[in-house]
Amino acid sequence: MKTFDDLKFTHHKDIQRWTASLELDNGYLFSVIAGDKEDDWSLPYGTYQNETFEVAVFGTQFDDNGDRKKVPLSLHDDVLGWQKPIDISKLMRQFQLDGKAHEDLLIAMREEKKKEFNLHKIKN
């Protein structure tokens, strides 16, 4: 089972970010980033020194441009911010165990929330 510890971070000094990505055996791709400085709010939702990270998950489906579709990780955003390593490991475990079923649940929850605000007719 893959975990946060399997991520290999690269520091990008020019943009003040740490980045890592990891594809699970079932095809889901995790993208994890963090900023250098705690006080720079233009950076990702997380700072490397504090061991908090922003995570996105890309599914196994592709859009018309050939890009992987993001999995909606919350009702209002495609990313989760300020995640600790254990949180990311838990999310990885969830996708490794439930994969498409978990993705379908998250998509259904997002669609239901959009209907509450009459946004369901707007394309992502």
Each language-model region and where it sits:
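Short helix-onset patch at the extreme N-terminus, typifying the N->h transition
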Residues: 6-8
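Charge-rich, low-complexity N-terminal segments
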Residues: 1-4
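Mixed-charge, Lys/Arg-enriched low-complexity segments
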Residues: 49-124
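Amphipathic, interaction-prone secondary-structure segments
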Residues: 10-53
